[in-house]
Amino acid sequence: VIVAPEWHGQVPAGLKNFFLLFSRFELGHKPALIVTVSSADGGAYPVAELRMSSYKNNRLCYIPEHVIVRNVEKVLNGNSEENDSSADAYFRERISWALGILAGYASALKPMRDSLQVHHDKFGNGM
């Protein structure tokens, strides 16, 4: 699960650096769920940015589903009195559903990761 706070409409630099430092050997052909958080109605730009470039050489496989937690201060708090109850229930259900999808992709991609087919020294980096 990749959690990215929206930072001025972008993914924070530290998270971008993570994707540059790790290679196909650590992340390759593993499924990932993108979760972005925003203090307002944003959060979509980091999803697009992650999908566009963060997987190139490390070969991380983003699943089609993602979660954008908007108005994050009003949901998922330990103290339920601080939550917007309907939004909180929605996000909890949505996150649970998305994690189930991620688990399915993890099972489906495991044989691919275990095969030698995905590790080719001549084609070590993305195009």
Per-range role (PLM):
Residues 63-127:
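Glycine-rich phosphate/pyrophosphate-binding loop and the adjoining helix
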